[in-house]
Amino acid sequence: MRRPSHTAIGTWSGGRYLHFGEPVAPERLEALLRPGDGIDTLLTADAYGSGQADELLGRALAGVERADFSIVGAIGHDFYVGQRDGPRGFPRFTDPALRGPDAYAEYVRMATERSLERLGIDAFDVLLLHNPDRTGYTSEVVWDALRAVRDEGLAHSLGVAPGPANGFTLDVIDCLERFGELIDWAMVILNPLEPWPGELCLAAAREHDVDVITRVVDYGGMFWDDVRPGHDFAPKDHRLFRAKGWVEAGVQRLERLRPIAERHGLTPMQLAAQWCLAHEPVACVVPTLIQEPGGRSIEDKRAELAATPAEILLVADEVAAIRAIGDNTGSMALKGAGPDHEGDARPDRWGLDERLEEVARRWGIEPERDLRQLTAARG
């Protein structure tokens, strides 16, 4: 097993499998993902490109000694039997329209084995449950199935990756309380301009000895410093779903952060990574490398990420000052369990029950204060 390093790249970089920036040629993305030159941890999910991202990463890994890289995989969306629902993507494998609990173990084993086959490796260093629904967070059957693939050597450690949108705070904490003895990793959204709600689950991660991977560290590409007011986004770019004015507001806050970065000889992206890593349970950051039209090359961004110091340079007062500048509390409607959900549960949103209300009390979270959209979205 090779433990994930402090910086990593995911197969969603380069715009081929998720719509961020210009899609790069497959050969270029393979070169970007090939371990070496300061980056040896790679993340993938089997649903990206319905397995194509796995296959491309497998080509990037060809000929590299297995001991020289760490692979974090993710399973959860059933693209084998499930039908894609437009922008919502493929259903979770726990969707009752696809199968019941008696078939969860078979699916988890199949999905894990096929992903490994596409990658050309024997085992994941970390295997994440990808974007679970309420069942995924709470079902002993699901986690027994994950335990089985770990115990059989198909994965060295397990974790949970909420998403795709922001939220799921109480669900992640509840999952750690239920299955903490199985869970070594969690992946959450966190960056200096989005400290909320990700920071709310970090104390529980620390308590349960769970290491955290943070994604969206680049804040939609802004910390790469080539997204400015008037930026030309492609018609299908995911960032078009962000609130109007997010670029302008973000750039204003970025400029307030720049002196802190310069004080330590860091780029804005390296500052964002350092800020995340300064939170005790955070062990790995995985920003998205985006090829902006007319912007810096993703190869240049990779080199910048690789040069991020592992040693934490920021002091506590700087971490707090950065948080205050980027404070986004209440700026968006969150996914997962929330006090403002009405009606039946959906795959990515549901109401609070007594157990989750008790979880909130234990961790000092007031749902009406901490998990509601309170202000107009800033992006």
Regions found by a protein language model. Name each.
Residues 18-24, 34, 88-191:
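Glycine/proline-rich, positively charged
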Residues 2-7, 38-41, 65-69, 121-125, ...:
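Short, well-ordered coil/turn segments that N-cap beta-strands
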Residues 22-23, 82-91, 226-233:
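Short, flexible, mixed-charge acidic loops at enzyme active sites
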Residues 1-4, 58-70, 116-120, 144-151, ...:
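Acidic (Asp/Glu)-rich catalytic clusters
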Residues 9, 42, 57, 71, ...:
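Conserved, mostly hydrophobic/aromatic
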Residues 12-14, 47, 74-78, 129-134, ...:
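Active-site beta-loop-alpha junctions enriched in small/polar residues
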Residues 36, 40, 203-379:
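Structured C-terminal cap/extension of enzyme domains
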Residues 1-73, 77-79, 363, 367-379:
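N-terminal binding-site loop/beta-alpha segment at the start of enzyme catalytic domains
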